[in-house]
């Protein structure tokens, strides 16, 4: 697993300090952007509510629970910047779960774009080129582990 620079860690921690206190609204911004960029992903969420307008889905309790879980994964990554390798098994399993529900690895890139969009919207002028790159570096490490889990899960499927 790759490592982040000390500057990357400092930038990520500093920006997450305020965002991490209010996870769900920031997560909703991220998922709103995700569904703008890749509307077909909305079909992967089979909740009891009709997700016809995207906003109905984004405000459903089940979906907000998913948003919370995603934001907690980001929080865990930020909390373990010095030892991201300790999250390896968790991230492998997360990749397997995403493969099992029909998420393809190309969608991970769109989630990354959506994360960066949320950071830009939330941080305003605090969103700088180096900050963007630091988050991208961390996200790349997280997604690499998830992709390995996704691939391993695919190997065990029989057609």
Curated annotation (Swiss-Prot):
Against SUPFAM superfamilies, the record matches this protein to: Globin-like (SSF46458)
Reactions catalysed according to its record? Fe(III)-heme b-[protein] + nitric oxide + H2O = Fe(II)-heme b-[protein] + nitrite + 2 H(+)
Q: EC annotation?
A: 1.7.-.-
Enumerate the residues binding heme b. 66, 98
Q: Where is the signal peptide?
A: none
Q: Which UniProt keywords are present, listed alphabetically? A: Cytoplasm, Heme, Iron, Metal-binding, Mitochondrion, Oxidoreductase
What's one GO-annotated cellular component?
A: mitochondrial matrix
The answer to whether UniProt assigns keyword Oxidoreductase to this entry is yes
Taking every annotated instance into account, which residue ranges of this chain make up the domain Globin? 3-151
Instruction: Extract one GO BP annotation from the record.
Output: cellular response to hypoxia
Q: Which Gene3D superfamilies match?
A: Globins (1.10.490.10)
Localization recorded for this chain is: Cytoplasm, Cytosol; Mitochondrion matrix
Q: Which GO terms describe its molecular function?
A: GDP-dissociation inhibitor activity; heme binding; metal ion binding; nitrite reductase activity; oxygen binding
Question: What family does the Swiss-Prot or TrEMBL record give for this protein?
Answer: Belongs to the globin family.
Q: What does the annotation say about its assembly with partners? A: Monomer. Homodimers and homotetramers. Mainly monomeric but also detected as part of homodimers and homotetramers.
**Purpose:** Monomeric globin with a bis-histidyl six-coordinate heme-iron atom through which it can bind dioxygen, carbon monoxide and nitric oxide. Could help transport oxygen and increase its availability to the metabolically active neuronal tissues, though its low quantity in tissues as well as its high affinity for dioxygen, which may limit its oxygen-releasing ability, argue against it. The ferrous/deoxygenated form exhibits a nitrite reductase activity and it could produce nitric oxide which in turn inhibits cellular respiration in response to hypoxia.
Write down what this protein is called: Neuroglobin-2
Q: From which source organism is this entry?
A: Oncorhynchus mykiss
State which gene encodes it: ngb2
